[in-house]
Amino acid sequence: RGLVGSEMCIRDRGYMRIYVAGSIFVMMTLGLNMFITTQGFAKISMKTVLIGAICNIILDPLFIFAFHMGVKGAAVATILSQAVSAVWVFSFLNGKQTKLRIRKEYLKVQPQIILPVMGLGLAPFVMNITESLINIAFNASLSKYGGDVAVGAMTILASIMQLQFMPVQGLGQGAQPLISYNYGAAKVYRVKKTIRILIVVSLIYTMAFWLFVECFPGVFVQLFNSSSPELYEMTTWAARIYMGMTGIFGIQMAIQQTFMSLGQAKLSLFIACLRKIILLLPLIYLMPMFIENKVFAVFLAETVSDFISVAVASTLFLCNIKKILAKA
């Protein structure tokens, strides 16, 4: 309540209760859709996402405005949309095309299978949960040193960074089954080729995006702000600092996805923790102690963290990849 305000807390609570009650549909859609992607049905997997998104776009105004449900209506629309996607996924996984069918006799908890799966899933879980902690830390520090304008700038920058990182994350998820399958089949050449393509393409995209942001930050800022000159000025200035090292961050994302694909849960988890928990979280609070411009120091923490984490991830990759592939 103290972080978001009492009025916002009441609205969020109404949304959250409905969303949590129906979250089983969200989990089923996200989890089972990966089994469609793994079999090579990328278009079907994409349709799963589109079905949920299109249904949500249609149902949102209906429940929010037509049925006068407000925020609760948005939650109902989201859950119903995900339920439609879940039905689509189930129908495909019980259809003629799929090789992996849902059968009652397969639904058994086997520790020798589920424990390694949980280990590999721990890294992305940590990444997602620490994202919330980082956002709280950034907002608290920027609110203290720069007020509402600095917090608003941070919100815009986080959205811009998502535009940069989401395609790379999708690329990595697409490469995972290719790397894992060929590694299991001892086709080391194909593994190396896939890893090389993943790293190169990820780096090219993040570098191109970074270069555009550094040269024309105002283009992205205008997408999120059209009314406040002060916010525009703050965000365009902060973008060059906050995203100063995101150009090379595609390397770390590719390396982390590679380690996950090769069954190296500990290395993948360490890289996930390194950037956010070990480096970024302390730097957000420590750097303003040593730099006069406190707002600049908070934004700079992201750049310093990115540089160190990419350097460490690259070193771990170069030192371990040959040993890992030798076990194929």
Language model features by range: what are they?
Residues 41-42, 70, 147, 228, ...:
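Short loop-to-helix capping motifs
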Residues 32, 59-60, 89, 122, ...:
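Hydrophobic/aromatic residues in alpha-helical transmembrane segments
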Residues 18-37, 45-53, 74-87, 169-172, ...:
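Short runs within selected transmembrane alpha-helices of multi-pass transporters and secretion channels
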Residues 22-27, 86, 124-136, 169, ...:
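Hydrophobic alpha-helical transmembrane segments in multi-pass membrane proteins
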Residues 26-45, 153-217, 249-268:
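Small-residue-rich hydrophobic transmembrane alpha-helices
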Residues 1, 5-22, 66-121, 179-245, ...:
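Short alpha-helical transmembrane segments in multi-pass integral membrane proteins
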Residues 6, 62-69, 132-159, 163, ...:
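Helix-terminus/linker motif at the lipid-water interface of multi-pass membrane proteins
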Residues 18, 52, 81-85, 89, ...:
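Transmembrane helical elements of multi-pass membrane transporters/channels
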